Amino acid sequence: LPQANCGGCGFPGCSAFADACVKSTSLDGKFCPVGGQSVMDKVGQILGIDASVTEPKVAVVRCNGTCDNSPRVNLYDGAISCKIANATSGGETLCSYGCLGCGDCVEACQFDAIHMNPDTGLPEVDEDKCTACGACVKACPRVIIELRPKGKNNRRIFVSCVNKDKG
């Protein structure tokens, strides 16, 4: 295992994931997103268990509230944290669903796979570096980041907005 201890597998770390694999009679439902299919194949080979094939995933930011699309109407002057901004002021735009732009997702990513775009104010995922560990998903208080299958030829279909209001 890669020893990333990211928790992307659903266990508190690589050691706990390894223990769960050793104690199982099947690797179904178990996957190390950092190591990918090749690591799971090796784990299966060592344990004498077939590793189920899991489609690779990547983090997707479901917000198009760029500086142009969702202009700032407030000035948030507090700790630079999406979690805090969401709980206290609701952010600087009128959109109560979109990205707050403080970069909690960037801080959570230990693989340097997500960065804030200074022009749009939104996070952008580097698909080549993203391991789909889910740390950015957990860090986002607005739940605008999802793990999606990479898709054929790295193509995905998704709506770049999580607003559920009518109209």
Language model features with spans:
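Ferredoxin-type iron-sulfur electron-transfer modules and their immediate structural context
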Residues: 1-122, 127-129, 135-167
